[in-house]
Protein backbone atom coordinates (compact mmCIF):
# COMPACT_ATOMS: atom_id res chain seq x y z
CA UNK A 1 0.00 0.00 0.00
CA UNK A 2 1.38 3.40 -0.98
CA UNK A 3 1.93 5.88 1.82
CA UNK A 4 1.72 9.62 1.23
CA UNK A 5 3.32 12.11 3.60
CA UNK A 6 1.10 15.21 3.58
CA UNK A 7 1.89 18.39 5.50
CA UNK A 8 -0.70 21.02 6.38
CA UNK A 9 0.84 24.51 6.62
CA UNK A 10 -0.52 28.02 7.12
CA UNK A 11 -0.86 30.85 9.61
CA UNK A 12 -2.25 30.34 13.11
CA UNK A 13 -6.02 30.08 13.38
CA UNK A 14 -6.82 29.33 9.73
CA UNK A 15 -8.27 25.90 10.54
CA UNK A 16 -5.45 23.47 9.72
CA UNK A 17 -6.30 21.18 12.64
CA UNK A 18 -10.05 21.49 12.05
CA UNK A 19 -9.57 20.41 8.40
CA UNK A 20 -7.36 17.48 9.39
CA UNK A 21 -9.65 16.28 12.18
CA UNK A 22 -12.69 16.64 9.91
CA UNK A 23 -10.98 14.35 7.36
CA UNK A 24 -9.75 11.81 9.93
CA UNK A 25 -12.57 11.73 12.49
CA UNK A 26 -15.54 13.25 10.63
CA UNK A 27 -16.25 15.94 13.17
CA UNK A 28 -15.72 19.67 13.56
CA UNK A 29 -13.59 21.03 16.38
CA UNK A 30 -14.71 24.58 17.05
CA UNK A 31 -12.53 25.49 20.03
CA UNK A 32 -9.13 26.93 19.15
CA UNK A 33 -6.21 25.10 20.71
CA UNK A 34 -2.95 26.11 19.00
CA UNK A 35 -1.09 23.10 17.62
CA UNK A 36 2.60 22.48 18.10
CA UNK A 37 2.66 19.41 15.88
CA UNK A 38 0.22 16.50 15.50
CA UNK A 39 0.41 13.48 13.25
CA UNK A 40 -2.56 11.53 11.89
CA UNK A 41 -2.87 8.42 9.73
CA UNK A 42 -5.84 7.30 7.67
CA UNK A 43 -6.34 4.58 5.09
CA UNK A 44 -8.40 5.76 2.13
CA UNK A 45 -9.18 4.75 -1.44
CA UNK A 46 -8.34 7.41 -4.03
CA UNK A 47 -9.07 6.67 -7.70
CA UNK A 48 -9.31 2.96 -6.93
CA UNK A 49 -5.96 2.80 -5.10
CA UNK A 50 -5.92 2.03 -1.38
CA UNK A 51 -3.38 4.29 0.26
CA UNK A 52 -2.27 5.45 3.67
CA UNK A 53 -2.28 9.17 4.36
CA UNK A 54 0.31 10.24 6.90
CA UNK A 55 -0.79 13.80 7.72
CA UNK A 56 1.32 16.23 9.71
CA UNK A 57 -0.69 19.09 11.18
CA UNK A 58 1.74 21.90 11.93
CA UNK A 59 2.04 24.98 14.10
CA UNK A 60 1.01 28.24 12.50
CA UNK A 61 2.38 30.34 15.34
CA UNK A 62 5.60 32.14 14.54
CA UNK A 63 7.31 30.92 17.74
CA UNK A 64 7.40 27.40 16.27
CA UNK A 65 8.79 28.43 12.89
CA UNK A 66 12.17 26.80 13.64
CA UNK A 67 10.47 23.39 13.40
CA UNK A 68 9.30 24.05 9.84
CA UNK A 69 12.46 23.07 7.98
CA UNK A 70 12.36 19.58 9.51
CA UNK A 71 8.81 18.71 8.52
CA UNK A 72 9.19 20.39 5.14
CA UNK A 73 12.14 18.12 4.44
CA UNK A 74 10.10 14.94 5.05
CA UNK A 75 6.79 15.99 3.49
CA UNK A 76 5.92 14.85 -0.04
CA UNK A 77 3.09 17.31 -0.55
CA UNK A 78 1.73 20.42 1.14
CA UNK A 79 -1.71 21.84 1.76
CA UNK A 80 -1.11 25.60 1.99
CA UNK A 81 -4.10 26.82 4.00
CA UNK A 82 -5.41 30.34 4.52
CA UNK A 83 -8.72 31.58 5.89
CA UNK A 84 -10.97 33.42 3.43
CA UNK A 85 -11.79 35.93 6.19
CA UNK A 86 -8.13 36.68 7.00
CA UNK A 87 -6.20 38.61 4.35
CA UNK A 88 -2.92 38.37 6.30
CA UNK A 89 -3.11 34.55 6.27
CA UNK A 90 -3.52 34.72 2.46
CA UNK A 91 -0.50 37.02 2.15
CA UNK A 92 1.53 34.63 4.35
CA UNK A 93 1.11 31.80 1.81
CA UNK A 94 3.94 33.22 -0.30
CA UNK A 95 6.43 32.82 2.57
CA UNK A 96 5.35 29.23 3.25
CA UNK A 97 5.70 28.36 -0.43
CA UNK A 98 9.13 29.98 -0.69
CA UNK A 99 10.34 28.17 2.43
CA UNK A 100 9.07 24.82 1.10
CA UNK A 101 10.85 25.39 -2.23
CA UNK A 102 14.06 26.39 -0.43
CA UNK A 103 14.04 23.40 1.94
CA UNK A 104 13.13 20.95 -0.85
CA UNK A 105 15.63 22.67 -3.18
CA UNK A 106 13.06 22.48 -5.96
CA UNK A 107 10.47 24.61 -7.74
CA UNK A 108 8.44 21.48 -8.47
CA UNK A 109 6.86 20.48 -5.14
CA UNK A 110 3.30 19.10 -4.97
CA UNK A 111 1.05 21.71 -3.33
CA UNK A 112 -2.61 22.65 -3.13
CA UNK A 113 -3.79 26.12 -2.14
CA UNK A 114 -6.72 25.85 0.28
CA UNK A 115 -9.10 28.68 1.18
CA UNK A 116 -10.75 27.52 4.41
CA UNK A 117 -13.83 28.83 6.26
CA UNK A 118 -15.83 29.27 3.04
CA UNK A 119 -19.01 28.84 5.11
CA UNK A 120 -18.45 32.33 6.55
CA UNK A 121 -20.06 35.37 4.97
CA UNK A 122 -17.34 37.79 6.10
CA UNK A 123 -14.99 37.07 3.19
CA UNK A 124 -11.96 39.34 2.76
CA UNK A 125 -10.12 37.20 0.19
CA UNK A 126 -12.09 36.78 -3.04
CA UNK A 127 -12.07 33.43 -4.85
CA UNK A 128 -10.65 35.16 -7.92
CA UNK A 129 -7.59 36.42 -5.97
CA UNK A 130 -6.86 32.92 -4.69
CA UNK A 131 -7.44 31.33 -8.12
CA UNK A 132 -5.05 33.85 -9.67
CA UNK A 133 -2.39 33.10 -7.04
CA UNK A 134 -2.77 29.33 -7.50
CA UNK A 135 -2.57 29.73 -11.28
CA UNK A 136 0.63 31.78 -10.95
CA UNK A 137 2.08 28.95 -8.81
CA UNK A 138 0.79 26.25 -11.18
CA UNK A 139 -1.13 24.50 -8.39
CA UNK A 140 -4.82 23.70 -7.75
CA UNK A 141 -7.04 25.90 -5.57
CA UNK A 142 -9.83 24.44 -3.45
CA UNK A 143 -12.21 26.19 -1.07
CA UNK A 144 -13.12 24.27 2.06
CA UNK A 145 -15.17 24.47 5.20
CA UNK A 146 -13.98 22.33 8.08
CA UNK A 147 -17.33 23.12 9.70
CA UNK A 148 -19.60 21.81 6.91
CA UNK A 149 -16.98 19.38 5.47
CA UNK A 150 -17.28 21.06 2.05
CA UNK A 151 -14.18 20.39 -0.05
CA UNK A 152 -12.27 18.68 2.78
CA UNK A 153 -11.75 15.31 1.08
CA UNK A 154 -11.27 17.06 -2.25
CA UNK A 155 -8.36 19.11 -0.86
CA UNK A 156 -6.47 16.15 0.59
CA UNK A 157 -7.25 13.80 -2.33
CA UNK A 158 -6.21 16.45 -4.88
CA UNK A 159 -2.88 16.73 -3.08
CA UNK A 160 -2.39 12.95 -3.33
CA UNK A 161 -3.11 13.19 -7.08
CA UNK A 162 -0.54 16.01 -7.36
CA UNK A 163 2.05 13.81 -5.60
CA UNK A 164 1.28 10.92 -7.97
CA UNK A 165 1.72 13.16 -11.02
CA UNK A 166 4.96 14.53 -9.55
CA UNK A 167 6.32 10.99 -9.09
CA UNK A 168 5.37 10.12 -12.68
CA UNK A 169 7.16 13.23 -13.97
CA UNK A 170 10.29 12.19 -12.10
CA UNK A 171 10.09 8.65 -13.51
CA UNK A 172 9.44 9.86 -17.07
CA UNK A 173 11.24 13.17 -17.52
CA UNK A 174 10.67 15.03 -20.80
CA UNK A 175 12.71 13.61 -23.67
CA UNK A 176 15.89 15.65 -23.85
CA UNK A 177 17.52 13.66 -26.64
CA UNK A 178 15.71 15.63 -29.33
CA UNK A 179 17.35 17.92 -31.88
CA UNK A 180 17.69 20.73 -29.32
CA UNK A 181 20.09 18.72 -27.20
CA UNK A 182 23.44 19.17 -28.90
CA UNK A 183 25.42 19.72 -25.72
CA UNK A 184 24.64 16.29 -24.21
CA UNK A 185 27.72 14.28 -23.46
CA UNK A 186 26.65 10.70 -22.91
CA UNK A 187 29.15 8.27 -21.47
CA UNK A 188 28.37 4.58 -21.78
CA UNK A 189 30.32 2.15 -19.69
Swiss-Prot record:
CDD domains for the chain: H_N_K_Ras_like
Lipid-carrying residues in chain (S-palmitoyl cysteine): 181, 184
Residues that bear N-acetylthreonine: 2
SUPFAM superfamilies: P-loop containing nucleoside triphosphate hydrolases
Principal location: membrane
Positions that bind GTP: 13-18, 29-35, 59-60, 116-119, 145-147
Catalytic activity, as annotated: GTP + H2O = GDP + phosphate + H(+)
GO cellular component: ciliary basal body; cytoplasm; cytosol; endoplasmic reticulum membrane; glutamatergic synapse; Golgi apparatus; Golgi membrane; GTPase complex
Covalent lipid adducts (S-(15-deoxy-Delta12,14-prostaglandin J2-9-yl)cysteine), residues: 184
Outcome following mutation: residue 61 to K: In NMTC2; somatic mutation; increases transformation of cultured cell lines
Reported impact of residue 26 to G: Loss of interaction with PLCE1
Keywords: Acetylation, Cell membrane, Cytoplasm, Disease variant, Glycoprotein, Golgi apparatus, GTP-binding, Hydrolase, Isopeptide bond, Lipoprotein, Membrane, Methylation, Nucleotide-binding, Nucleus, Palmitate, Prenylation, Proto-oncogene, S-nitrosylation, Ubl conjugation
Annotated consequence of substituting residue 144 to I: GTP-binding activity reduced by factor of 25
Keyword hit for NAD: no
Effect ascribed to mutating residue 170 to R: Increased Ras signaling due to impaired ubiquitination
Quaternary data: In its GTP-bound form interacts with PLCE1. Interacts with TBC1D10C. Interacts with RGL3. Interacts with HSPD1. Found in a complex with at least BRAF, HRAS, MAP2K1, MAPK3 and RGS14. Interacts (active GTP-bound form) with RGS14 (via RBD 1 domain). Forms a signaling complex with RASGRP1 and DGKZ. Interacts with RASSF5. Interacts with PDE6D. Interacts with IKZF3. Interacts with RACK1. Interacts with PIK3CG; the interaction is required for membrane recruitment and beta-gamma G protein dimer-dependent activation of the PI3K gamma complex PIK3CG:PIK3R6. Interacts with RAPGEF2.
Associated disease: Costello syndrome: A rare condition characterized by prenatally increased growth, postnatal growth deficiency, intellectual disability, distinctive facial appearance, cardiovascular abnormalities (typically pulmonic stenosis, hypertrophic cardiomyopathy and/or atrial tachycardia), tumor predisposition, skin and musculoskeletal abnormalities. Congenital myopathy with excess of muscle spindles: Variant of Costello syndrome.
Name this polypeptide is given: GTPase HRas
Gene designation: HRAS
